[in-house]
């Protein structure tokens, strides 16, 4: 399904220079709850119904996942990416930070540990935790069975933000 179905996501223009990119203004989780109730696992594409024009907006997928987790009162959010998680040195996988507290994030940004594409991802994590999601895990989706390892073992994968 898409974020347009059931008006799951409603958005307005994020930036006048990027007219097809939106920011989520409202989440209507009922279609997701109905899907769960009928025994299905929803897979949602990150587009939203436009509320300020006729049409749709593209939405950052991490932001869409974060906003949906918040609206569903989820305990955990898992974001898949193409790196092991948050690393002190992005070129050295041995510097993986397995656990990070939200209170540490400003210093990690200041020290340039969090840069580039990791900035919006971490900001989504912080927002989710501050708004009730107990933890967010950033992990490498290329690792075989990474979701199962994270969910069904004590081993854990990636970086846990809490």
Predicted regions and their residues:
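Nucleotide/pyrophosphate-binding catalytic subdomain
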Residues: 1-142, 155
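Short, basic/aromatic-enriched C-terminal tail that caps enzymatic domains
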Residues: 146-162
């Amino acid at each position: 399904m898409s974020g347009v179905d059931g008006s799951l996501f409603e958005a307005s223009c994020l930036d006048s220079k990027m007219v097809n990119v939106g920011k989520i203004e409202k989440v209507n989780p009922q279609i997701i709850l109905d899907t769960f109730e009928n025994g299905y696992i929803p897979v949602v594409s990150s587009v939203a119904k436009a509320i300020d024009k006729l049409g749709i907006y593209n939405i950052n997928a991490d932001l869409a996942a974060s906003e949906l987790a918040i609206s569903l009162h989820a305990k955990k959010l898992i974001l898949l990416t193409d790196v092991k998680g948050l690393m002190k040195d992005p070129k050295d996988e041995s510097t993986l930070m397995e656990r990070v507290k939200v209170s540490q994030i400003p210093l990690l940004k200041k020290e340039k540990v969090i840069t580039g594409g990791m900035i919006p991802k971490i900001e989504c994590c912080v927002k989710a935790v501050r708004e009730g999601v107990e933890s967010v895990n950033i992990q490498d989706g290329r690792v075989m069975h990474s979701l199962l390892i994270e969910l069904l073992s004590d081993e854990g994968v990636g970086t846990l933000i809490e």
